[in-house]
C-alpha cells in the first residue's frame, strides 16, 4: 500500500515540471515550488485538481476556463498557500480548538421567543443586524453542558473572551463587506439551538453536533475560504502587480484573482483592525 509520503515523492517531480507550463509571474511560481517541495498531500491534491482544469481547458482551447483555472491558482497561492501568518487569535483558535468549542456562545430559539424585546436582547438578532452590542451580551452564554468538562482548561475566562472577541470582530467585518467573501450578511457565528416541530428543544446529541458543525465552519471560513492577508504579504502582491503593469493580460489576471483580498493589521498590540487590500484601489 502506497504511503502518503511515497505518494508525495512520486507527485513532486510531476508537479515541479508543471510549473514550466504556467504563464504566471516568477514570485508566484517560486511560492508554488516551495510548497511542492514540502510534499504536503492536501495541498498537492488541491493543486492537482486545479492544474487538471487548466490542462484540459488548454487542450480543448477553452480560453475562458483556462483563465478561470489560472485565477484559482493565483488566488490559492497568494491568499491561502502562502499566507502562513495567521492573526494571533487564529493561532490561538488552532491551538485551543477543543477548549473554545466547549465554550462557544449559543442561544436557544425558545429563549428568543420568550423575550419581550428580542431585537435588543437576542444574540441572534444582534448578529443579524451587525450590532456591536452583541460583544457585550454573548459572554453570558459561553458555558455549555453538552461536552465533557476538561479538568484543567489552559485558558482563563478572560483569555477565551479575548479570543472570541477577535474571532467575531473578523466575522463582523466580513458580514459588513460581503463583496470580499462568501459570507452571507445574515450569517450568525454563534450556535443557534432550534426547536422541534412540536415546540420543545432538540435533544442533547443534536445540540452537540450543532456546536461541532458551527465551530468547524468558522475555522474553515477564517483560515481557508476567506482568510485575511498580512501586511507583509500585501506588499508582495503589490510588488507583483507593479512588476506586471506592462503585461496587461497577466496584470488583469492577478487583479481578478485577488479582487476579494482584505488585510489584517496587528501593529497595534491592543486592537487588530481589518481593511480592503491597498492593491484593490
Swiss-Prot record:
InterPro entries named in the record: Gep5 (IPR031455)
Signal peptide: none
Pfam families xrefs: GEP5 (PF17053)
Record flagged with keyword Nucleotide-binding: no
One Gene Ontology term, aspect cellular component: mitochondrion
UniProt-listed GO biological process terms: mitochondrial genome maintenance
Keyword list, A-Z: Mitochondrion
Keyword Mitochondrion listed: yes
Subcellular location: Mitochondrion
Primary subcellular site in the record, as a coarse category: mitochondrion
Family under the similarity heading: Belongs to the GEP5 family.
Function: Essential for respiratory growth and required for maintenance of mtDNA. Required for cell survival in the absence of prohibitins.
Protein name: Genetic interactor of prohibitin 5, mitochondrial
Naturally occurring in which organism (per UniProt): Vanderwaltozyma polyspora (strain ATCC 22028 / DSM 70294 / BCRC 21397 / CBS 2163 / NBRC 10782 / NRRL Y-8283 / UCD 57-17)
Gene name as annotated: GEP5
